[in-house]
From Swiss-Prot:
Keyword Amino-acid biosynthesis: yes
UniProt name for this protein: Serine hydroxymethyltransferase
Cofactor(s) annotated in UniProt: pyridoxal 5'-phosphate
Organism field: Bifidobacterium adolescentis (strain ATCC 15703 / DSM 20083 / NCTC 11814 / E194a)
Entry-linked NCBIfam families: PRK00011.1
Biological pathway: One-carbon metabolism; tetrahydrofolate interconversion; Amino-acid biosynthesis; glycine biosynthesis; glycine from L-serine: step 1/1
Positions bearing the site annotation: Plays an important role in substrate specificity: 239
Gene that specifies this protein: glyA
Taxonomic lineage from the root: Bacteria, Bacillati, Actinomycetota, Actinomycetes, Bifidobacteriales
Amino acid sequence: MTASPLAQTPNDMFNAPIAEADPEIAEILDAELSRQQNGLEMIASENFVPRAVLQAQGSVLTNKYAEGYPGRRYYGGCEQVDKIETIARERAKSLFGAEYANVQPHSGAQANAAVYQALVKPGDTVLGLALDHGGHLTHGMKINFSGRFYHAEAYGVNPETFRIDPEIIRQRALETHPAMIIGGWSAYPRIEDFKAMKEIADEVGAKFWVDMAHFAGLVAAGLHPSPVPYADVVSSTAHKTLGGPRSGFILAKQEYAKKLNSAVFPGQQGGPLMHVIAGKAVAFKVAATPEFKDRMQRTLDGAKILAERLMADDVKNNGISVLTGGTDVHLVMVDLRNSEMDGKQGEDLLAQCGITINRNTVPFDPRPASVASGLRIGTSALATRGFGPKEYEEVADIIGTALAAGQDVDALKARVDKLAEDFPLYPGLDQIH
């Protein structure tokens, strides 16, 4: 008599590959791999991790609890994870020229929460870039912890240039007397003046914190000014341009080490995710290589090529423009305020072509955030796949043509398919199991 699958012993299930243990989840994982391989990922906050990072995150380190810090754990058996966390911290410090690093934050938002806890008190005034002008939820949005537990004030971009203007920040700082000024952004295409912002913070007696989650990879490659010499504390994610696992980390001057360590653990988190910290260590090593710098240069080149194509007459004639007239970073902000097309429609149109982006609000947006009047388009993931100028010109033309007149979607999709085929992602990995 054949035993029912339900009669399997726990050991059978323990040792079974995912295709046998949970075919439903395995099928979805395979479908997601296919989606990533066969489309073009251009969401500015997304990237592809190296295989070595996938291996680290899928390792036996996922089994280990390690509350505390290396040499000061609250659990036994931490000899190996202590080594890994120490390596990750030292690599982060070396990569960014920082005195201190904490690699335990589970995410960028957790890292940011720890910064608040370490530098300011509940009810203190903080001053950050407005969300609808390119800021982040954790920079003071009212429904976020940062806007609920702190008195959040905002500065916006210059209404004529759409650029962050230090003089506007200074005036807002003089008006609001913040305990902390926040630099960094999630949807802004230019470089901030960290030196000027630090001078403003000093003038009003505020701490200066920069969230470099989006541009950390560019900083690591030496292709973007570093906030580390100017900011009291710098937070970041390890993914986005840096191309590591989805997670966060914090850099700072040594004088803030004790407060930040306590804010991360036990202030915000319990046990760190050691398999993710191993992935961060690998990503930091990769980011220190010439290969990574070349990838970041191609990322910047691709963004400029895209911006130039989207400023062509056929796109302009559809009421579409590029915010600030170009880009200095890995993303382009497309302005649809004068177009009949809204952000949701633009996102859906490009999805039909096989290109994934996201709609985004733009400064002074007349439309609700659910549809928005902007598109945020990033070039990091394509550089990771190996795209160079020729390929960026092709994908830029696909996007420009689609937005200009909604040309034959099937023909545009065929061009996308060819690009994806020519630059395979994780070649040889056809199934998760």
